[in-house]
Amino acid sequence: MDTVSAFKLEVRADKIAVITIDAPGEKMNTLKAEFGSQVRGLIRQLRDDKSVRGVVFISAKADNFIAGADINMIARCRSAQEAEALARQGQQIMAEIHGLSIPVIAAIHGACLGGGLELALACHGRICSDDEKTRLGLPEVQLGLLPGSGGTQRLPRLIGVSTALDMMLTGKQLRPRQALKAGLVDEVVPQAILLQAAVELALKGRPTSREVPVRERVLAGPLGRHLLFQFVGKQTQRKTQGNYPAVKRILQVVENGLAHGCSSGYAEEARAFGELAMSPQSQALRSIFFASTDLKKDPGAEAGPGSLRSVAVLGGGLMGGGIAYVTACKGGLPVRIKDIQPRGINHALKYSWDLLNKQVRQRRLRPVERDRQMALISGTTDYQGFAHRDVVIEAVFEDLALKQRMVSEVEQYGGPQTIFASNTSSLPIGDIAAHASRPGQVIGLHFFSPVEKMPLVEMIPHKGTDPQTIATVVQLAKRQGKTPIVVADKAGFYVNRILAPYINEAMRLLVEGEPIEVIDNALVKFGFPVGPIQLLDEVGIDTGTKIIPVLESAFGERFSPPANIIDAILKDDRKGRKNNRGFYLYETKGRKSKKRPDPAVYPLLGIGRPQSRLSAQQVAERCVMMMLNEAARCFDEQIIRSARDGDIGAVFGIGFPPFLGGPFRYMDTIGAGEVAAILQRLAAQFGPRFTPCDTLLRMAEQGTTFWPADERLT
């Protein structure tokens, strides 16, 4: 049976050929290997039909042009040569599109990313819709790759090298007006007239080459290019610590093409694509992509979700304000905030207003849209209107009696359908539900701060939580733009439990005399976005350490921090960035906030003159191995449902280095035997807290892995 083509060609009366892209049976258009022959067939038709005056590519999908290449194509490659051949095939198809003698225009609505933008770049002109869904970018670097179908050569020549590098090295996506300003598109029009505008552009003949700004022309010259690549190279090295080889290869490939011409650039691009596709960093980053994609489809429970029409939030503090914002502004759901004080409600409303107003100032949101979203959020000091709320999210103080009272009151004033979701970070959900009349509708929903930025939520059912409750709250989290993982109702849940030993070990290194910045820099070099001590400052020392006694009580001495260190810091009123003094001092100059280690911390903790005695590798090893050992325990105790969930939880929740794929993929890469051996060596040097858990010893003996063998390469 013939495969249904994703490309349909129709020639209009005005002799403009419209190629409609519609991948059969798919919500998103993604470029697949078999599409190559389909496009080539259309190009042959266009060459043969001399009456055709121009071509327009447009998508039949509701919200995407082409969202990129099908990543599974790369996963199926077993060598750099296979991946290089894949890139060359893409380059050849784009060259054939660009080589047509008649004007070819891309009419873009929705996501135009990766291979989709490379196809648009191969066209002679581009028009996009002014819709909020329209985004243009080359995000391959986020998968440890580079654009492999000509993007590294065409983009710099179209918009200038510095702007192109910014897009490719960061994966930044441009909105319609940004794309127009950059010269990436020729026009921005309402979606309703997108096709007509593209046809009119095609009828005018090939668009004339856009003049690149003077600054970009200077940077494209030999001297300017040398200085630019030298500067950007140093900047990216500082940001990536050399952990992401794709950024270095992007710089090399772009520079090669500018210095030696497109032919050399295309050859180098394909070669680099092949190398990067086989790199462990890209394989790890692609595993994160596949895992997060799987989680988006995971309903969380076998039951179907209940209705989800409106939500309430208890508490107008930092977390409550953030939860209200993502519920209304990301999820589009009406939210009512309850606080005992009007100022708490006002604080939460201001939180959303400030975030929305910032988007208005940045021209990412129209004032009328800001006002519409704000209208979804209301406040109350009583339970008026709670009978109609499907989910009530509690974000009050970490006090068990208070949370139990909240459950009782919500059951009294809410409807029979109302779910109670607690944002606790430390209290057992079973205890919170202990006196509930409808315990099946009580669940934990642990957000991370700041709520609007952190992508993860932990979903914590207790033993009596109904499957429908789980499914409903998972659906809510997805509407809020979050990635939910379901974790067991045990002390610390998952993320805080693996984070605490890591933080504690950093504190021990500090007490031993390692300077604050040396510890943090070592973990940044390892691949974390910030070091453990700075992380504590960012979260808030008072907030971040509340979980430690809970974990110490549940699991014993291995969770004990160095004696009195936290008490001494808190008694000196050091809370971190929020009061401008923690382990670091913070000062704001203009729009920039600067931090520096506070030397007064050392005498406060009874530390003499700090002096670095360990290498960055030794510092990182001690902190990371404590985290890995605890993650293995969580896996064994079924705190997480799978290695997939554990990796996503660590990467999205605490910034575990994505290029390592998460703690479980990292342990699989180096081997359970090696992890156990390192822990045994550290235990002999520093004490029994490093003793490898039984799970690691058993896996080392059996030669098994956390990830199933058939999932390790996807």
Swiss-Prot record:
<dbReference type="InterPro" id="IPR001753">
    <property type="entry name" value="Enoyl-CoA_hydra/iso"/>
</dbReference>
<dbReference type="GO" id="GO:0005737">
    <property type="term" value="C:cytoplasm"/>
</dbReference>
<dbReference type="InterPro" id="IPR008927">
    <property type="entry name" value="6-PGluconate_DH-like_C_sf"/>
</dbReference>
<protein>
    <recommendedName>
        <fullName>Fatty acid oxidation complex subunit alpha</fullName>
        <ecNumber>4.2.1.17</ecNumber>
        <ecNumber>5.1.2.3</ecNumber>
        <ecNumber>1.1.1.35</ecNumber>
    </recommendedName>
</protein>
<comment type="pathway">
    <text>Lipid metabolism; fatty acid beta-oxidation.</text>
</comment>
<dbReference type="GO" id="GO:0008692">
    <property type="term" value="F:3-hydroxybutyryl-CoA epimerase activity"/>
</dbReference>
<comment type="function">
    <text>Catalyzes the formation of a hydroxyacyl-CoA by addition of water on enoyl-CoA. Also exhibits 3-hydroxyacyl-CoA epimerase and 3-hydroxyacyl-CoA dehydrogenase activities.</text>
</comment>
<comment type="similarity">
    <text>In the central section; belongs to the 3-hydroxyacyl-CoA dehydrogenase family.</text>
</comment>
<dbReference type="Pfam" id="PF00378">
    <property type="entry name" value="ECH_1"/>
</dbReference>
<keyword id="KW-0560">Oxidoreductase</keyword>
<dbReference type="InterPro" id="IPR006180">
    <property type="entry name" value="3-OHacyl-CoA_DH_CS"/>
</dbReference>
<keyword id="KW-0511">Multifunctional enzyme</keyword>
<dbReference type="GO" id="GO:0006635">
    <property type="term" value="P:fatty acid beta-oxidation"/>
</dbReference>
<keyword id="KW-0413">Isomerase</keyword>
<dbReference type="Pfam" id="PF00725">
    <property type="entry name" value="3HCDH"/>
</dbReference>
<keyword id="KW-0276">Fatty acid metabolism</keyword>
<dbReference type="InterPro" id="IPR006176">
    <property type="entry name" value="3-OHacyl-CoA_DH_NAD-bd"/>
</dbReference>
<dbReference type="InterPro" id="IPR012802">
    <property type="entry name" value="FadJ"/>
</dbReference>
<feature type="site" description="Important for catalytic activity">
    <location>
        <position position="118"/>
    </location>
</feature>
<keyword id="KW-0520">NAD</keyword>
<comment type="subunit">
    <text>Heterotetramer of two alpha chains (FadJ) and two beta chains (FadI).</text>
</comment>
<dbReference type="GO" id="GO:0070403">
    <property type="term" value="F:NAD+ binding"/>
</dbReference>
<dbReference type="Pfam" id="PF02737">
    <property type="entry name" value="3HCDH_N"/>
</dbReference>
<keyword id="KW-0456">Lyase</keyword>
<dbReference type="InterPro" id="IPR036291">
    <property type="entry name" value="NAD(P)-bd_dom_sf"/>
</dbReference>
<dbReference type="InterPro" id="IPR006108">
    <property type="entry name" value="3HC_DH_C"/>
</dbReference>
<keyword id="KW-0963">Cytoplasm</keyword>
<dbReference type="GO" id="GO:0016509">
    <property type="term" value="F:long-chain-3-hydroxyacyl-CoA dehydrogenase activity"/>
</dbReference>
<feature type="region of interest" description="3-hydroxyacyl-CoA dehydrogenase">
    <location>
        <begin position="306"/>
        <end position="714"/>
    </location>
</feature>
<dbReference type="InterPro" id="IPR029045">
    <property type="entry name" value="ClpP/crotonase-like_dom_sf"/>
</dbReference>
<dbReference type="GO" id="GO:0004300">
    <property type="term" value="F:enoyl-CoA hydratase activity"/>
</dbReference>
<keyword id="KW-0443">Lipid metabolism</keyword>
<dbReference type="InterPro" id="IPR050136">
    <property type="entry name" value="FA_oxidation_alpha_subunit"/>
</dbReference>
<feature type="region of interest" description="Enoyl-CoA hydratase">
    <location>
        <begin position="1"/>
        <end position="190"/>
    </location>
</feature>
<keyword id="KW-0442">Lipid degradation</keyword>
<feature type="site" description="Important for catalytic activity">
    <location>
        <position position="140"/>
    </location>
</feature>
<comment type="similarity">
    <text>In the N-terminal section; belongs to the enoyl-CoA hydratase/isomerase family.</text>
</comment>
